[in-house]
């Protein structure tokens, strides 16, 4: 099983220590709950990963680990085959000892859009909600974060994260917990909170914004990234059963409406800092994610529309502060 003991020891010494009142019991319950059918085999695969520590680690320009001397051809083949057991790899990319995990999403492109607009992360304690396999956690560490905590209930993402961590020399500056935001108490302990690609999956988006606010310290910063539609502050798309083949999409507001939602929840200094159409080069099928991707979800005769006839994915980034 996954051992969270190092994380407990870490937060016992900082301003997250009150989380220990409930977190160990929650994760113990998670360990007993209905796990994914492949979870035990994924954990066994994790145990079979070789112990490797990088002689060069670059988390500033990517998630890039290298070793001198490099892996032999046979070692690379063996490691590649192990990492492929964790497919599909959706968020990345990762470059690990000459093995390039070309993920479905170019999450580095999103990071490049976000980074110029946020407060410096040096020395900060950070929460990333819906963090996927933790790619952005490592980039936060690369920007000097003291501790980057991700939450995501998807068990494959947890195993992918732990695989990468093991190949980064068991780095303890980032941690992923298999929880949803609704399972967190109001910690009020994070300097920065990220919620990227989550809001439109929530049945009650304002409740989600309140939950994010409750995790921040006073004067803490929220980075919110979401699907949006063009329009004024009164515009919101409520799609039918599917949007771009996704079932669980409830509200896609305009960026101006999201700004009003944030202000209604008590955030201040709210700014829309970026808005960009998602290109098929940013989300696509790869050798590490071989099922359908964005190009399959768009109208084949008009790439400005989804296959259901809605506006094609447009994403906005907003920055806000908790007073």
From Swiss-Prot:
Organism: Photorhabdus laumondii subsp. laumondii (strain DSM 15139 / CIP 105565 / TT01) (Photorhabdus luminescens subsp. laumondii)
Protein name: tRNA U34 carboxymethyltransferase
NCBIfam families: PRK15068.1 (NF011650), tRNA 5-methoxyuridine(34)/uridine 5-oxyacetic acid(34) synthase CmoB (TIGR00452)
The organism's place on the tree of life at top rank: Bacteria
Function of the molecule: Catalyzes carboxymethyl transfer from carboxy-S-adenosyl-L-methionine (Cx-SAM) to 5-hydroxyuridine (ho5U) to form 5-carboxymethoxyuridine (cmo5U) at position 34 in tRNAs.
EC number: 2.5.1.-
Keywords: Transferase, tRNA processing
Binding site for carboxy-S-adenosyl-L-methionine: 91, 105, 110, 130, 152-154, 181-182, 196, 200, 315
The keyword Transferase belongs to this UniProt entry's keyword annotation: yes
């Amino acid at each position: 099983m996954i051992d969270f003991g190092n994380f407990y020891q870490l937060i016992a010494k900082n301003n997250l220590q009150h989380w220990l009142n409930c977190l160990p019991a929650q994760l113990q319950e998670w360990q007993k709950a209905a796990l994914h059918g492949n979870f035990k085999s994924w954990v066994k695969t994790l145990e079979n990963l070789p112990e490797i520590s990088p002689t060069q680690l670059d988390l500033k320009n990517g998630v890039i680990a290298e070793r001198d001397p490099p892996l032999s051809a046979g070692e690379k083949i063996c490691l590649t085959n192990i990492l492929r057991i964790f497919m599909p790899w959706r968020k990345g990319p990762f470059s690990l000892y000459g093995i390039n995990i070309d993920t479905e999403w170019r999450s580095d492109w999103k990071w490049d859009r976000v980074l110029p607009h946020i407060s410096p992360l040096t020395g900060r304690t950070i929460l990333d909600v819906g963090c996927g396999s933790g790619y952005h956690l490592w980039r936060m560490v690369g920007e000097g974060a003291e501790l980057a905590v991700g939450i995501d209930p998807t068990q494959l993402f947890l195993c992918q994260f732990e695989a990468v961590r093991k190949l980064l020399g068991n780095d303890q500056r980032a941690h992923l917990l298999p929880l949803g935001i609704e399972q967190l108490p109001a910690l009020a302990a994070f300097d920065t909170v990220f919620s990227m690609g989550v809001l439109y999956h929530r049945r009650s988006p304002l409740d989600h914004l309140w939950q994010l606010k409750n995790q921040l310290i006073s004067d803490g910063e929220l980075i919110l990234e979401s699907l949006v539609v063009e329009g004024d502050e009164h515009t919101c798309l409520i799609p039918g059963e599917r949007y771009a083949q996704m079932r669980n999409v409830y509200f896609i507001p305009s960026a101006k409406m999201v700004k009003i939602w944030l202000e209604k929840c008590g955030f201040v200094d709210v700014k829309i800092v970026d808005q960009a159409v998602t290109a098929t080069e940013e989300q696509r099928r790869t050798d590490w994610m071989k099922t359908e991707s964005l190009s399959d979800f768009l109208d084949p005769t008009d790439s400005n529309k989804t296959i259901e006839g809605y506006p094609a994915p447009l994403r906005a980034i907003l920055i806000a502060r908790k007073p």
